[in-house]
Amino acid sequence: MKISCFLLMIFFLSCFQINPVAVLDTIKCLQGNNNCHIQKCPWFLLQVSTCYKGKGRCCQKRRWFARSHVYHV
């Protein structure tokens, strides 16, 4: 019984290893000071890429005014 529990534990641990390559899109998003959302980005954020192995969305703050609309004094 102990051996079968041990083998079962080894099997589960080998199945649920974290893949460091699978989260590269999430790391890239967070390094750009963006946010990762599972569902659609809120209206005040723009989607710029993906997160969580393509299952989420990388959202960035919108630019409310373009530089061409700013009046210089």
From Swiss-Prot:
Entries under InterPro entries matching the protein: Defensin_beta-like
Keyword DNA damage: no
Leader peptide range in chain numbering: 1-23
SUPFAM superfamilies referenced in this protein's UniProt entry, alphabetically: Defensin-like
GO CC, alphabetical: extracellular region
Keywords assigned by UniProt, alphabetized: Antibiotic, Antimicrobial, Defensin, Disulfide bond, Secreted, Signal
SS bond list: 29-58, 36-51, 41-59
GO BP of this protein: defense response to bacterium
NADP listed as a keyword: no
Organ and tissue specificity: Only expressed in epididymis (corpus, cauda and caput).
Localization per record: Secreted
A Pfam short name: Defensin_beta
Known role: Has antibacterial activity.
PANTHER family: BETA-DEFENSIN 40, BETA-DEFENSIN-RELATED
Family, as annotated: Belongs to the beta-defensin family.
Record's protein name: Beta-defensin 40
Species assigned in the record: Mus musculus (Mouse)
Gene this chain is encoded by: Defb40
